[in-house]
Amino acid sequence: MLLGLQWGDEGKGKIVDVLTPSYDIIARFQGGPNAGHTLEFEGEKYILRSIPSGIFQGDKINVIGNGVVLDPILFAEEARALSRSGHDLRKRLVISRKAHLILPTHRMIDAAQEAAKGGAKIGTTGKGIG
C-alpha cells in the first residue's frame, strides 16, 4: 500500500509504476483526477489521472475502488487515449459501482468556494474535488 500524506503531487504514481511488475492487482482505493502523473511506456508519454498505471502491464488487473472520485469526462478521454494505443481496458480494468462521480456542479462549487477564500485560498486544481 502506498499512501500520500501531503497535499498531493508527491510522486505516488511514478512509484506505483515502478512497483507494478511485482503485483497481480493494482488498485486505486481513494483520490481523484487532480494533476495526474506522466509516464512513458514504449516510447509514448501518457498522463494518467484515474486509471491505475498497472494498465501498462499486460497481465495485471487494475481496480478503481469505491473511494475514488471519478470524473466521467476526464475518464473517457483517458480511456480513449489508452485504447487508441492498443491498451484493452475492458479485460483489465474493474470500476466499483460505488465509485463517486464528479459532476459539472462540483467544479462550479469548487471554484466558488476557492474564490470566496480570497487571499487564504489553497490553490485547488479546479477539478471539483476540493
Where are these regions (language model features)?
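Non-transmembrane, aqueous-exposed alpha-helical and coiled segments at domain scale
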Residues: 1-129
